[in-house]
């Protein structure tokens, strides 16, 4: 099973790239983690935010291979703790499909992305900067994988 993080935003600071890559490289070959960056729409004083969200959403959905399970990160989504995420990861593996996790931009996700999702996950009740979410996601997914394989990374 491959996991894709599809995130709005490009040209992240070096610390974001390094943090994400630190966890991405730890994933096993049979469960690679891939990052697909979607160019954010230009947000100015008179920006049409609804149109920007629509364009970003179209680009996100176009990046998802046919048949993938779509999971959105969204405030009203399910709140999974680490053991619950590990259970989700196991269920996704048993489902036999790759997983695409969508990370929206500053205004969140387009309605079309939310409508296409099979699951919605609330990463935190906190508002997190979007660059940091990439690192938190990579680490959380790696930790969940470590639980499913009894790898010593996760300690209770």
Swiss-Prot record:
Its EC number(s): 2.1.1.177
GO molecular function per UniProt: rRNA (pseudouridine-N3-)-methyltransferase activity
Keyword DNA damage in annotation: no
Entries under InterPro entries matching the protein: Alpha/beta_knot_MTases, RlmH-like, tRNA_m1G_MTases_N
EC main group: transferase
Pfam families assigned: SPOUT_MTase
Signal peptide: none
Residues annotated to bind S-adenosyl-L-methionine: 73, 104, 123-128
Localization per record: Cytoplasm
SS bond partners: none
Catalytic activity: pseudouridine(1915) in 23S rRNA + S-adenosyl-L-methionine = N(3)-methylpseudouridine(1915) in 23S rRNA + S-adenosyl-L-homocysteine + H(+)
Classification via Gene3D superfamilies: 3.40.1280.10
Keyword vocabulary terms for this entry: Cytoplasm, Methyltransferase, rRNA processing, S-adenosyl-L-methionine, Transferase
Principal subcellular localisation of the protein: cytoplasm
Protein family per UniProt: Belongs to the RNA methyltransferase RlmH family.
Subunit structure, interactors included: Homodimer.
Known function: Specifically methylates the pseudouridine at position 1915 (m3Psi1915) in 23S rRNA.
UniProt xrefs under NCBIfam families: PRK00103.1-1, PRK00103.1-4, tRNA_RlmH_YbeA
Identification of the protein by name: Ribosomal RNA large subunit methyltransferase H
Lineage: Bacteria, Pseudomonadati, Pseudomonadota, Gammaproteobacteria, Vibrionales
């Amino acid at each position: 099973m491959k996991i894709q993080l599809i995130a709005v935003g490009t040209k992240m600071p070096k610390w974001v790239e390094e943090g994400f890559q630190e966890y991405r490289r730890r994933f096993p070959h049979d469960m690679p983690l891939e990052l697909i960056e979607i160019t954010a729409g230009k947000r100015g004083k008179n920006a049409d935010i609804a149109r920007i969200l629509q364009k970003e959403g179209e680009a996100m959905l176009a990046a998802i291979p046919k048949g993938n399970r779509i999971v959105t990160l969204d405030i009203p989504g399910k709140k999974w703790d680490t053991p619950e995420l590990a259970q989700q990861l196991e269920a996704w593996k048993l489902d036999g499909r790759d997983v695409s996790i969508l990370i929206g931009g500053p205004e969140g996700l387009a309605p079309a992305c939310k409508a296409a999702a099979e699951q919605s996950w609330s990463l935190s009740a906190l508002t997190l900067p979007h660059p940091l979410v990439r690192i938190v996601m990579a680490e959380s997914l790696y930790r969940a994988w470590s639980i499913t394989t009894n790898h010593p990374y996760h300690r209770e």
